[in-house]
């Protein structure tokens, strides 16, 4: 019997940040006899029949760690094919002293630009670091393996062809400086017929301080009436929002591999992005120079249509959730 342990912060399709993780869980479960999910928060009804969920929720960080290890230990004794830690290096670090003596492979899935001591330490104890692209993790290590993003393409209908001019622009992502929303607002000032709708969570004090600054900038640029600053949305609402848009904008700085870019592409929408990581997905007409609003505005103005179906095909071929799950299992075999 093949058994896999998957550790994440939330296994809940309504979570605005981690809702897409449930599709990954289902794809993994389809390829093993039993999948054990350990998470702080779990929506049991969302898990497949061959999936067992254990919550390690607790009021304190120490309590969560203790409950996590208490749930993990008996699963390791049953010798799973691997433990996959999702996005949080601390899960791999805590698991290592228990997994290594039993020779249970340990994998970390990580796609953020920000690293830190926990990630550096986790790299030393895991067998493999899985990510979207070798550039989408702040590491240089032979342990890094690119396996695509794991997009649930079937959940994202292909919208009708969007022809220019693109008037209804959409941005999805945190209200954080790294997301480059100031660049997008300044580009909007050069597109007098366009509107912009933003939706995203505010996860930190810095995020909560940044949103009012963006609202003030919109007023300063005289685009306030054309911008909607929305809150975080449940993951299930994303296909609907994409269906309302003419195009998606993503100005995240650095080597970002933001999931929304792949989701928009899978929806056959033109998506304009600045990260170099998208050079294998987006044609030149959809890629702009980060921090240069005029570059983004010009790309939107000059878009002549036709990119949608090819974008979806590329996501399906290289970034589908089924392909992702298969590559995870191959990496820990």
Task: For each feature predicted by the language model, list its residue ranges.
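Aromatic "clamp/platform" in nucleotide-sugar-dependent glycosyltransferases that forms part
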Residues: 253
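Short hydrophobic beta-strand element within catalytic cores of glycosyltransferases
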Residues: 268-274
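A conserved mid-protein helix/loop that constitutes part of the nucleotide-sugar donor-binding site
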Residues: 19-26, 176-194, 209-212
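Glycosyltransferase donor-sugar binding loop
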Residues: 40-42, 195-213
């Amino acid at each position: 019997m093949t058994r896999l342990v998957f550790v994440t912060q939330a296994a809940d399709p309504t979570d605005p940040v981690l809702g897409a993780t449930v599709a990954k869980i289902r794809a993994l479960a389809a390829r093993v006899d039993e999948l054990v999910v350990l998470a702080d928060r779990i929506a049991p009804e969302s898990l497949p029949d061959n999936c067992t969920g254990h919550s390690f929720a607790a009021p304190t960080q120490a309590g969560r760690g203790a409950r996590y290890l208490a749930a993990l230990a008996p699963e390791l004794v049953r010798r799973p094919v691997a433990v996959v830690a999702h996005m949080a290096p601390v899960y791999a670090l805590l698991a290592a002293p228990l997994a290594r003596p039993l020779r249970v492979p340990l994998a970390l899935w990580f796609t953020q630009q920000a690293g830190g001591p926990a990630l550096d330490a986790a790299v030393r104890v895991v067998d493999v670091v899985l990510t979207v692209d070798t550039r989408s993790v702040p590491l240089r290590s032979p342990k890094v393996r690119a396996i695509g993003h794991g997009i649930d393409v079937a959940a994202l209908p292909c919208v009708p062809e969007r022809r220019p001019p693109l008037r209804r622009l959409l941005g999805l992502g945190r209200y954080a400086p790294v997301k480059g929303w100031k660049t997008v607002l300044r580009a909007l000032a050069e597109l007098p017929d366009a509107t912009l709708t933003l939706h995203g969570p505010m996860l930190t004090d810095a995020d909560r301080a940044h949103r009012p600054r963006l609202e003030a900038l919109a007023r300063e640029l005289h685009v306030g009436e054309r911008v909607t600053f929305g809150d975080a949305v449940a993951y299930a609402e994303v296909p609907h929002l994409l269906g309302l848009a003419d195009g998606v904008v993503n100005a995240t700085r650095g080597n970002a591999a933001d999931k929304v870019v792949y989701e928009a592409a899978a929806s056959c929408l033109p998506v304009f992005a600045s990260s170099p990581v998208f050079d294998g997905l987006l044609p030149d007409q959809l890629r702009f120079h980060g921090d240069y609003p005029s570059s983004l505005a010009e790309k939107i103005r000059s878009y002549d249509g036709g990119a949608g179906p090819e974008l979806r095909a590329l996501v399906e071929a290289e970034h589908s959730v089924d392909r992702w799950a298969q590559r995870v299992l191959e990496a820990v075999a």
